[in-house]
Amino acid sequence: MCASNSNPQDFIDLKIRIFPNDASVAGYPVEITLGGQREFQRGRVSADILPWVSSGVPAEDGQRLFDTLLADQVLRDAWAASRESSSRRRIRLRIDADAAELHALPWELLQQGSVMLSAHTDTPFSRYLPIELDWSDPVKERPIRVLVVISDPDDLQAKYDLAPVDVDLERKSLESALSTVGKDELQADFLDAPATPERLEEALRQGMHGGAAGYHVLHFVGHGAFSRRRARSALYMQDEQGRAKRMLDDELVSMLARQGVQPRLVFLSACQSATRSQADAFLGLSPKLVSAGVPAVVSMQDVVTVETARKFGATFYRQLLEHDQVDLAVNEARSTLLTAGRVDAAVPVLFMRMRDGVLFALQEEVEEKVQVSLTGGEGGIKIGGDFSVSGRDSISGKG
């Protein structure tokens, strides 16, 4: 993994917590905490923030959302104080589950002046979900193992009026992004078509054979759907004949939980895969994955163009493998979308339960672990072998 100019310790933690609507204060109480210790006086966001109506101009919406969030003088003062403490702030937005209606707002648009906070290198941004689980240490095993699932059912267009997935193009795009890493650093396996739930589960099992730690990353490319009436999310997988087969959110969560080892990152490059019901903050696919133990989930909160998803994914992986910080990588990938003039740049969303955004150990930590192994210590790992992303065989999912 390449050296990075950015260190997690360079950022000061800034948590913005929004509490449920409180009639006694005519709005939603808001609490800003800096560095995990300095807690500012609570302010409030007016209940008039809902319903949210987009102007159709992302920059205007972002500034309006920012001004509404910090309309209370107490909150403006807290924000100003945080900027005085450090220009580099890791922003974690925590919305209480009982304020679920606020999850539908496009918080990734938040803009102060000319700066979109979720696209600036000084303000890594995430939707933070506090889960009562032990913190996961950064991955020190090498190679980092990625399972890629590209689902292109034959009847997508005829049955659901959805565009076919260009499997070859998607694979080449991912291979290009991942090949920037040394061959001993990362291993990418592509699930063979048809991408059935059964083959996916078998591939996850194979990933833990021989004492391996399982897949660190699960990357899905395809289409998703959300039922507002049923408040359910689904991914379009395939059956054995290659036709569309819906995999419901609970089914995917249960499958991952059964494997014993959760991926550290799930990337859902699927339309609507991050949309959630306003009735319950944890009914969407991404929050369910985080609540089940996945440290970080990148997904889409609305319909997204294929080109946007592709550009975002390629930049995201390059940057993540450069400095190991998932929230910073999302910001950098979003910045690329803005530079390219993509109007849906705010659609990708990061949900995470980590405080510092670090998924993978820094290179010096990995080298230290390898040295322990070479000197006979416990917990060593084997790094080596001939590997190239483009030349690797696919996993078929068969025993």
Question: What is each residue range found by the language model?
Answer:
Residues G391-G399:
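C-terminal, disordered and strongly charge-biased linear tails with low hydrophobicity
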Residues R90, P143-I144, V261-R264, G293-P295, ...:
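Short coil/turn connectors at secondary-structure junctions
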Residues M1-S126, P138-K140:
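Non-catalytic, solvent-exposed interaction/assembly segments
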Residues P124-L129, V217-T315:
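Catalytic cores of nucleophile-dependent amide-cleaving enzymes
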Residues D72-R83, Y128-D134, P197-Q206:
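Short alpha-helical segments and helix-capping/turn motifs at coil-helix boundaries
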Residues W135-Q241, L268:
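A domain-level signal for caspase-like cysteine endopeptidase catalytic cores
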Residues L109, S114, S118-L133, Q241-V261, ...:
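Caspase-like cysteine protease fold
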Residues L102-L110, Q157-A158, R276-S277, F360:
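Short helix/loop capping segments that flank catalytic or ligand/cofactor-binding pockets
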